[in-house]
Design a protein with these regions (language model features):
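Charge-dense, helix-prone N-terminal extensions
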Residues: 1-122
Length: 122
């Protein structure tokens, strides 16, 4: 869902009730792990920028919750941990078919790795 919300707080008020808790948890983890990043709304969803470049984002899409980890080294290091039923992923996108499929420990690990990464952004 491409939101027109100008702030993440407003965005979270728009999302479907069954996804709200998971999206709030994603935001909490992003804010804790990505110190020094700017929280913005980009591409219709919450995004986290460093030096003007979006490195992480998430969104409630029509059929899934999308988590966007845009550091290629971080995605590559976590691919095996993402190979679970109900989760699909590509170059920088992770798609969770249901909120309960999100392994927040893996997400936290990816966010911490993003904070430390100097790798390429896809």
């Amino acid at each position: 869902m491409q939101s027109q919300a100008k702030a993440v707080t407003a965005y979270l008020k728009e999302v479907p009730a069954e996804r709200k808790a998971a999206l709030k948890k994603l935001r909490q983890l992003c804010r804790a792990a990505l110190t020094g990043f700017e929280e913005t709304m980009e591409y219709g969803g919450p995004s986290y920028k460093r030096n003007g470049v979006v490195e992480v984002g998430f969104a409630s899409q029509k059929n899934f919750i999308g988590l966007y980890i845009l550091r290629t080294d971080v995605m590559n290091a976590h691919r095996d941990l993402l190979k679970v039923r109900g989760v699909s992923f590509g170059k920088g996108a992770i798609r969770y078919s249901k909120p309960e499929r999100i392994d927040f420990n893996v997400v936290e690990s990816m966010l911490r790795a993003t904070h430390e990464s100097t790798g390429e952004v896809c």
